[in-house]
Amino acid sequence: MVALTEIKEYLRIPFDDEDTFIQAIIDAGYIYLENAVEYYHELYESNNSFSNLADFWVKTQWCPTAFDNREGMLAGNVQLSYTARSIITQLQLYTYKEGGE
């Protein structure tokens, strides 16, 4: 899981005023992936390339969009870019195999 400090560095946010909101955005990104990808938790725990791609998506696609468009996020109007949707599709194509990658 991507840390709050890592997201703040990526978004270039030097102050702590919005830490609670940024953490909520991070959490919402992972919840979004949980709902979009079958066997999300199993894949995240057992497959490094999957977890790296999921973290990359949260860091580079979800968090910047959510932070910049907070009014839309709060209203439930999520507009994902082509890149964000493509990465989700890649994550959805991973298959979970009991006992390994």
Question: Can you name each region flagged by the protein language model?
Answer:
Residues 1-101:
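Divalent metal-cofactor coordination and adjacent catalytic microenvironments
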